[in-house]
Amino acid sequence: RDLRMSRGLGDVYKRQMLLYDNTKQEAYMKPHIHTITELAIFTAIAFIFSYIESLFPLPIPFPGIKLGLANLVIVLVLYKNGFCQALTVSIVRGLLNAFTFGSLFGFLYSLAGSVLSLIIMNLLKNKTHLHISAFGVSVAGGITHNIGQFAVAAWLVGPSGILPYFPFLYFSGLIAGGLIGAFVLLCRQRIPLFSSTN
């Protein structure tokens, strides 16, 4: 009888531990699933913006200059989810672009610009004592994004052939970053999902 009782208590203990482990695992997985789902949605939106922008190129006689609507999503993710998540969205979006309507070289340009601009934007965003707004961060990101792309082009074809092109890239990054920054401020003021972020 004592042996049966001991086995019964052991079974109850095992069931309780199994239930505890399952509950603990669910509590651990829920925020991760939410984050993955959220980033997937942001990536899809950024990809759609890139695709729409590819259908309506700007009437400018300089190749590669565009507004970069997808960067609106990237900057918002940077403020809401942080650097790593913004970088993830940017890289996955770049890969989707390359596999659908882009090219390998286009992905290299995009990757260089995205990584450099995100590093700079993250540094400026975290320098809270400088009081740099999301608008200023976005402007810096627009400029450094084009600088990163220029660096890749200079490495591939040589700097002498594209050096005269640099001022146009600089000012286009300045203008695009300003426009994106204005939209970022508007989204953070009007959309509750982003309004509580730093």
What are these regions (language model features)?
Residues 29-77:
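Hydrophobic transmembrane alpha-helices
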Residues 31-42, 67, 71, 86, ...:
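Residue-level signature of transmembrane alpha-helical entry/exit and packing/kink sites
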Residues 39-41, 48, 89, 110-144:
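Short helix-perturbing small/polar motifs within transmembrane alpha-helices
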Residues 50-67, 92-121, 157-161, 165-166:
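Interfacial aromatic-anchored transmembrane helix boundaries in multi-pass membrane proteins
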Residues 103, 107-108, 127-198:
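Membrane-embedded alpha-helical hairpins and interfacial helices in multi-pass inner-membrane proteins
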